[in-house]
Amino acid sequence: MLKILIPTVMLIPTAWLAPTKWLWPTTLLHSLLIALASLSWLKNASETGWSSLNPYMATDPLSTPLLILSCWLLPLMILASQPNHTAHEPINRQRMYISLLTSLQFFLILAFSATEMIMFYVMFEVTLIPTLILITRWGNQTERLNAGTYFLFYTLAGSLPLLVALLLLQNSNGSLSLLTLLHSTPPQLSTYAAKIWWTGCILAFLVKMPLYGVHLWLPKAHVEAPIAGSMILAAVLLKLGGYGMMRILMTLEPLTKELSYPFIILALWGVIMTGSICMRQTDLKSLIAYSSVSHMGLVVGGILIQTPWGFTGALILMIAHGLTSSALFCLANTNYERTHSRTMLLARGLQMALPLMTAWWFIASLANLALPPLPNLMGELMIVTSLFNWSWWTIALTGLGMLITAGYSLYMFLMTQRGPLPSHIMALEPSHTREHLLIALHLLPLLLLILKPELIWGWS
């Protein structure tokens, strides 16, 4: 565990001490080495499932894929941010930018590997600070302050009941260790209080996912964030909600059986509603942000149904969606750098100008609509099957949701790549090797996971 944490911390002095000329290459290489070293976590041979144990941190088959995804994203964020956001900024601000990204990765590693629920809660909250600074300081438009406020208050309002609920659990059990939490009993409360306690436990994670209804902060935050902010938000920060739900639901039995139904229905209804919103979007980043809400709705359904297939499908879909949506944000950013517009009508027909980028757009769009045999489809099918097994009425919602997903993914591809090239963007800068490498490092892991899906199966 320390072989990842210490180099991650040392990346901050590296960013501040590296010469100006070598700042980005040095930090990129350093973070890439950390990402490669993190792959050793996949080799989990222990019988209990827990490995790399020390009193505060451990990895198990649920947290390992998410930890590796967090480490994998830092070099990609540095690669994506190099020329555009930072070339015209003072050198100290560039160093600060890299330090923020590094601190975010450090907090995420601590969150995903925490063995104590309170430590997880603290890290869950602390990730808010670097993300908020990224959005409000490096965002594009003045609306970034509004987006930052939404992000802050939604997250805080959802998280405070969780702290109270965890302290209540600590009071009745004497411990909040994840290793013993599975075998503990929920606090003995009156029926009404128990229901409020259950909602308090789950609300913070539903806001973070986000569940349809408490999702308003997400499109704002995504649209206003710089490219690195959008990538880490879509790929890893939303997954904190799913991970926390999987961890805490184990202790909430038997309350979940009776209280989870409205949330499952709301999540599946959200898949259809946010998909329909995507069909009417004109802003490219906003479309990708709403598609995240749609996919996370399926994940919420898969987790709340609490079957082994549901959990496995949710984890697979979280990992696959993390790589896919991050790739889509990078592609949207390459368009934005050239056309200086996120409006799809003003940047059409880019296949004529950037044909190789169109190939990447095509693969990423197909991954988003869950083409077989990609992990996206595997995750969605497992969730849909476990929901259908619970109630066959859900097939109407999930089937329609998947149909709409295919519709808006193709709409996004056709609107950006096909059609006549507008007259105001005739002279475009050609695509760079850096951009192709960036997208390849998103999509290659996704394609290679087809060959060994048990790496992201989780517990089952």
Curated annotation (Swiss-Prot):
Top-tier EC class: translocase
Catalytic activity: a ubiquinone + NADH + 5 H(+)(in) = a ubiquinol + NAD(+) + 4 H(+)(out)
Keyword Mitochondrion attributed: yes
Localization of this protein: Mitochondrion membrane
A GO molecular-function descriptor: NADH dehydrogenase (ubiquinone) activity
Alphabetical list of InterPro entries matching this protein: NADH4_N, NADH_Q_OxRdtase_chainM/4, NADH_UbQ_OxRdtase, ND/Mrp_TM
Enzyme Commission numbers on file: 7.1.1.2
Membrane-spanning residues: 22-42, 61-81, 97-114, 118-140, 149-169, 196-216, 226-246, 259-279, 286-305, 309-331, 352-372, 395-415, 437-457
Organism superkingdom: Eukaryota
Keyword Membrane: yes
Function: Core subunit of the mitochondrial membrane respiratory chain NADH dehydrogenase (Complex I) that is believed to belong to the minimal assembly required for catalysis. Complex I functions in the transfer of electrons from NADH to the respiratory chain. The immediate electron acceptor for the enzyme is believed to be ubiquinone.
Protein family according to the UniProt entry: Belongs to the complex I subunit 4 family.
Protein name: NADH-ubiquinone oxidoreductase chain 4
